[in-house]
Amino acid sequence: MITEAQLVEDPTLLLRLFIPALIRNDVEGVGLLLSIYEKQKKQEDDELLIWGNAIIARKNKQLDKSISLYRSLVSRNPKLVFARLQLAIALFENKENEAALEQFDKLKSENLNDNVIDIINKYSELINHQNDWSFNGGIVYLNESNINNSPKLGVNTANWKSTSKPESAEGFSYVGGAEKKLSIYKNYFSLLNFRGKGKYYWDNSKYNEISSRVKVGFGYKDLTNEVLFLPFVEYSWNPNKNQQNSSTFHRYSNAIGTEAEINNWLNKQWKNSLSVELSRQSYHKTKLLDGNVYSVSDTLLYISNSNQYWFSGIDFYHKEAKSKANAFDRFSVRAGWGQEWLQGISTRFQVGYAKRIYQGAIAEENNYWVPDFYKKPQKNDEYSVYITLWNRNFYFYGITPKITWAYQKIDSSNLFYSYDKNNFYLEFSKYF
């Protein structure tokens, strides 16, 4: 029988008992040993002390406090996989299912024993069979330096000269959604999804916009596969751009179509996501834009461990229109890397390239008043870079602010459609 006096006199023995108790989530053992360990450690930011207090807080049903401590611990040391597992379970108990599932998916990439994998799978199944409503929302601060995508002032060719100036706009974008799953039979379910988004600029309101999409369909999901079939309707509104600072919204377009998604875990580290969308777009005033839209997107995700992932993707977008000058095909590729660093720092880096080819020219061949590039179908080379930075230790009400630098460059066969711009965005989002 080991006494408290022996543990106080022998810190090595105390650690040999305390660390396994933390890993096993042995609530009684942690409760007995934590008070002894606290007497030896005067540093409140000691990792083992934080871990022990997180376990005790969860035992006392103080889930918000427990989650906060676990997040702090995993932020300091992302390699503590058993602390991450306990964080995921606490998130599940606090009904933060999306955040919990994200942590469980990261843990699957680690070299864990079969018993732990079984625990992860059981919690993942419970989340997949939830019938509760889920909600999400986000807001992003915007400070656009070239919202009208203007070319550089003074670009000229064939006696034509660019006179438009880049317009700035400050405001925010917003998004909100609600989703309800209803289990039908075993892994089959029906799904109802509402999603709305928009942009609001307080100093250049003619660029404001609102859109909403409603999806009703069904799906199948197990531990490795998910299939969704979701017919939808979508509406969008914007102000009259010919009226400066107009704040009255008018119906701009509507679409009816179908989404299909297939998500498949190839193994514990590789996941492939394929989405296909078919729709018919109709415009309220600009009827020349009416037409079908087809898009295909495929993304391959590799989670190397619980604090690092890589991804790549290819996309194809086909837009039909009555006016061939507005119909185009767009092929794109993208790749990126996400990393959780020590001390709570996280980063995400993405680069992309796209080729856009229009089906028709803007002007007729016999029009001698315009440059030659207006008489040929436009072709664009489109480049993008996104870098996102955030600190997992800095959050409030479950929201972690993220800052993104975005760079976009368009090289077009039509010189007046070539431009580049870079912006910073500040994002706040939450699932609940």
Regions found by a protein language model. Name each.
Residues 1-12, 37-47:
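TPR-adjacent "capping" and linker segments in tetratricopeptide-repeat scaffold/adaptor proteins
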Residues 1-2, 19-24, 28-31, 42, ...:
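Gram-negative and organellar
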